[in-house]
From Swiss-Prot:
Lineage top rank: taxon: Eukaryota
Location, primary (coarse class): nucleus
Keyword set includes Transcription regulation: yes
InterPro entries: B3_DNA-bd, DNA-bd_pseudobarrel_sf, Plant_B3_domain
Biological classification of the source: Eukaryota, Viridiplantae, Streptophyta, Embryophyta, Tracheophyta
Subcellular localization: Nucleus
Keyword list, A-Z: DNA-binding, Nucleus, Repeat, Transcription, Transcription regulation
Pfam families membership: B3 (PF02362)
Cellular component, GO, one term: nucleus
Protein name, per record: B3 domain-containing protein At2g35310
């Protein structure tokens, strides 16, 4: 009986094994950041380490992450880790604790830089989960399609697109009023009163994270941590990028470095961001 009791206690202790991480935006996707501590890993069998980790947050969302191995240590697979980081808008020195609950299931507790625990998902994540794409009348192009079409034109050009917006029928009559408005753009660098946009010049440090001037921050950006979806103009590639606010400063953090490498961006480029939704942008790049 005593031996069984000791075995049960050992199993319970193993279930409660835990480790922590402090997330720094510069190396948030590195193997070292994704590494599992040696003292933590050695209490698990090879069979257990061949399974996926299932990470569950306080509000119920969960993520599955493969476990990989190099000659020195075990670590969390990159795409699963980056999905977890992006969904939770992490990358600004958050303190995370991972607690094993058995069968490679983990709970994660996320503490912000100010010491407060995150008890609900970031605003944009809950917004995206609850929202649906708006319906469009047949034959009317979306703004995203309009901007993508512009980016494929060459040299100087001028496009004028008419959008029709039908007003709802009045309750006492069947008259319908059509509103017609147009969006004119002279070139890829021209501004439009109908499209919110801003431009940034790429410096070397901006290939890792992009800091915004106060003028852009106050006019265009949210006042809290948010996940932005940034599209390539051809609309075939997009990136989830974390926008973080730290005091009076703000920047694109987790996910931005990957975008800069894959787009790709280079020092001297001019980046123009055009809004197509509240937290969704198209990125146009002009080379020097």
């Amino acid at each position: 009986m005593a031996r069984n009791s000791d075995n049960d206690m050992c199993k319970e202790e193993r279930k409660r094994e835990s480790f922590f991480k402090v997330l720094q935006r510069v190396d948030i996707s590195s193997e070292n950041m994704r590494a599992l501590p040696y003292d933590f890993v050695r209490s698990f069998s090879n069979n257990e380490l061949s399974r996926k980790m299932k990470i569950k947050a306080r509000w119920g969302s969960s993520w599955e992450v493969e476990i990989c191995k190099n000659p020195r240590f075990y670590f969390m697979e990159k795409s699963g880790w980056e999905k977890f980081v992006s969904d939770n808008a992490l990358g600004a020195s958050e303190f995370l604790t991972f607690t094993h609950k058995g069968n490679m299931r983990f709970t994660v507790n996320i503490f912000m830089q100010d010491g407060k625990e995150m008890l609900q998902p970031p605003q944009s994540m809950s917004f995206m989960a609850s929202s649906r794409p708006p319906k469009r009348e047949q034959g009317i192009p979306s703004l995203a399609t309009t901007i993508a079409a512009e980016s494929n034109g060459g040299g100087n050009y001028k496009r004028k697109l008419n959008f029709e917006k039908k007003k709802a029928e009045e309750s006492h009559n069947s008259k319908r009023t059509d509103k017609v408005f147009s969006v004119q753009r002279e070139s890829a660098g021209a501004s439009s009163s109908s499209v919110a946009e801003f431009s940034m010049f790429i410096k070397k440090s901006y290939l890792i994270y992009m800091w915004f001037p106060k003028s852009v921050q106050s006019i265009h950006m949210p006042k809290q941590r948010t996940i932005f979806k940034i599209h390539h103009p051809n609309m075939k590639k997009s990136w989830n990028v974390v926008y973080v606010v730290s005091g009076t400063k703000s920047s694109f953090s987790a996910g931005w470095k990957g975008l800069a490498q894959e787009y790709p961006l280079a020092v001297g480029d001019t980046c123009k961001f055009s809004f197509i939704k509240q937290h969704e942008l198209i990125l146009f790049v002009s080379k020097p």
